[in-house]
Amino acid sequence: MIKRAFTIFILTLLLFFNSPVYSLDNSSKTLEKYTKKISNKFTRTFCNTSKFGISYEGALAFAIGETNKEFKNNKLNKLIDYSLLKNLIVNDLENDCQVYDFTISKLENLKFN
C-alpha cells in the first residue's frame, strides 16, 4: 500500500513539474559574431605587442597564446571554421595594423582544443 502511494506521488510530481529542455542556440549569426570577436582580440594583441617593440615572431607567439587562453573553454569552438577565422585575422591585420606580409600559415597554432 505504501509502495503504491509512493509510486503515485512520484508519478504525479513528474507529470506536473516536468519542464521542457531546449537545445543550445548555435545560429550562424552567433558563430559569426564569436569568430569576429576572436579575430579582433588576436589583431589587437598582435598590433599592440608589435608596436611595443617586440619582434613579429614574439608578437605572434604572444597573440596566439593570449587568444588561446581567453577562448579555449567556449562551447562554440567545436563549430568554428578555422579557415574563415584565419582569413579574418589576416584581413584585420592588413586593415588595422598595416601588416601586409602576414601569411595564413603562421596561424597554424591557433586552435582551441
Report each predicted region and the residues it spans.
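Unusually extended, aromatic-enriched hydrophobic runs near protein termini
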Residues: M1, L15, F52, E94-V99
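Residue-level marker of intrinsically disordered, low-complexity segments enriched
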Residues: F6-I8, S19, F52, K78, ...
